[in-house]
Amino acid sequence: MAVDNLKKILETWDDNKDNSSEEFWHKFFEENSVILGQVFSIPVTILGSKAYVGGKKLDNKGGKYPDYLMIYKQTRNTALIEIKTPKTQLLSSEYRSEVYTISREISGAISQLLTYRDKFLKDYYSLVHNSSDTERFYASNPQCILIAGNAKQELCDSDKKQSFELCRSNSQGVQIVTYDKVFEKVHTLVNLLEGK
């Protein structure tokens, strides 16, 4: 049964690789949270979808809402996930010979996630003030993850791959994961469960 569900998830991915609706992907990940778990090395669950993490001013504006607030099951520490779409451009045009810059969409999403984390850390105590011990969560340097783009489709030559990997590995505080890599992990899980 579990393998069949994972195969349906992979079918949806195959049918929607070109789907540029962020709302579609948000709903899909929320309904199939096992997918989001593939980007972590330890078990997690969704604590909140579009959860308020702080930032409101006196006029009740400016609140910050990442796509997902995740919680590590054992430690109850948190992580923030922001999603874009598989069609989100990873790189801009060639900057110099053999060098590409990260796209405006990716750099903007990184700034967005870091702002969410900053507000979350500043407002943490007011957010958990009335929580019981069983409801309490922690914000000990919460991990930030951005899911965007499709490396297999976009990074078609070694210069683009190298530029992206250099930008990704030097992105302080935000882990960038492409959609194709997330679903590759689901595919690997299916193979393991089927004994392949």
Where are these regions (language model features)?
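Charged, terminal alpha-helix-loop-beta segments
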Residues: M1-K196
